């Protein structure tokens, strides 16, 4: 998975899309680590935190820019974020 697909310029590292791609890359690495080290509970906690952060960013992106959100979840092959009921 490359970040260059989603980044328009190098100064755009704070964009929501870049952050989601970065979290997805970290989540994939940590998932591979946890397949080998099943009892690494601190890493499991870190994974849950990253998943939560990515999920919150996805919800925010879906609220402000729905076409970009749909494009991103298709390219990254991740599930759709749960919508807020409030």
From Swiss-Prot:
Pfam family membership, one: Ribosomal_S15
Matching InterPro entries: Ribosomal_uS15 (IPR000589), Ribosomal_uS15_bac-type (IPR005290), uS15_NS1_RNA-bd_sf (IPR009068)
Compartments where located: Plastid
GO biological process assignments: translation
A Gene Ontology term for the protein's cellular component: plastid
Primary location: plastid
Keywords from the UniProt entry: Plastid, Ribonucleoprotein, Ribosomal protein
MF terms in GO: structural constituent of ribosome
Subunit description: Part of the 30S ribosomal subunit.
Family: Belongs to the universal ribosomal protein uS15 family.
PANTHER family the record matches: RIBOSOMAL PROTEIN S15, BACTERIAL AND ORGANELLAR, SMALL RIBOSOMAL SUBUNIT PROTEIN US15M
Protein name (database record): Small ribosomal subunit protein uS15c
């Amino acid at each position: 998975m490359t970040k260059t697909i989603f980044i328009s310029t190098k100064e755009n590292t704070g964009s929501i899309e870049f952050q989601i791609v970065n979290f997805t890359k970290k989540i994939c690495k940590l998932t591979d680590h946890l397949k080998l080290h099943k009892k690494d509970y601190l890493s499991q906690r870190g994974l849950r935190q990253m998943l939560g952060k990515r999920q919150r960013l996805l919800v925010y992106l879906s609220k402000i820019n729905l076409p970009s959100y749909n494009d991103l979840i298709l390219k990254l092959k991740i599930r759709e974020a749960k919508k807020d009921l409030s």
